[in-house]
Amino acid sequence: MACILKRKPVLVVSFIALCILLLAMRLVNDATFPLLLNCFGQPKTKWIPLPYTFRQPLRTHYGYINVRTQEPLQLNCNHCAIVSNSGQMVGQKVGEEIDHASCIWRMNNAPTKGFEEDVGYMTMVRVVSHTSVPLLLKNPDYFFKEASRTIYVIWGPFRNMRKDGNGIVYNMLKKTVDAYPDAQIYVTTEQQMTHCDRVFKDETGKDRVQSGSYLSTGWFTFILAMDACYSIHVYGMINETYCKTEGYRKVPYHYYEQGKDECNEYLLHEHAPYGGHRFITEKKVFAKWAKKHRIVFTHPNWTLS
């Protein structure tokens, strides 16, 4: 009897230690947890990431300047969810999972209202092309009043973003912050735009301008997210071979509108002699980055060789 009583404290301590170990493993591997589930034959297991708080003081990103205050962006996230605009998101029902991330990133004018079950309803960072700014301004109350806590990062060429009164998009943004003083709108600096072009050339061996292409909003999103996030979970983005896969799922280019077929649009842009986005080429680079950073792609899952 005495031996049994002596063992009880040992068993309790061991049990507590095991629980702490499992929790630590979950925290460390949260970014890759969906893939670990797949390894154990649970590809359909619902994964809800643990809620995070900022893990350290906000980090300053000097390539992004606030339109109203002219101060650089300060942002630092633990677990980021990047939600693709792709029709792949239709019917996925991962909105609750997405909203558990510490920072939820969206692109251009992709809405959440009416699509919450699939894509969630929260947005912390929205990266927007200069060409999509007029689309935001069609519904300014929704984007800049109701979503005043969202950080907007606008990218675009110098001719549209110049601050001397001749930058047509910058002028739109100035008027927007005058009308919505709480709006957090940042623009990408000319130096940061050059940096993004340089990264494209370093990764692909091709000069973006000479190849007649434009970087996508996804490219600018990844550049900032890899600098601001400890781990990244990308939802709804296809890889570079998806459209060549037999029996692939045909979906709209955007989850929020019918019309263009995603794969047709990708192939059209990839081979356009001028003015296209090299979506497929970019996906090859994203796969390369995922091997070096804590990046996971799901819905559909990516296999990184």
From Swiss-Prot:
Membrane topology, Cytoplasmic segments: 1-8
Compartment(s): Golgi apparatus membrane
Transmembrane segments: 9-28
InterPro entries according to UniProt: Glyco_trans_29, GT29-like_sf
Primary location group: Golgi
GO biological process, one term: protein glycosylation
Name under which the protein is recorded: Alpha-N-acetylgalactosaminide alpha-2,6-sialyltransferase 3
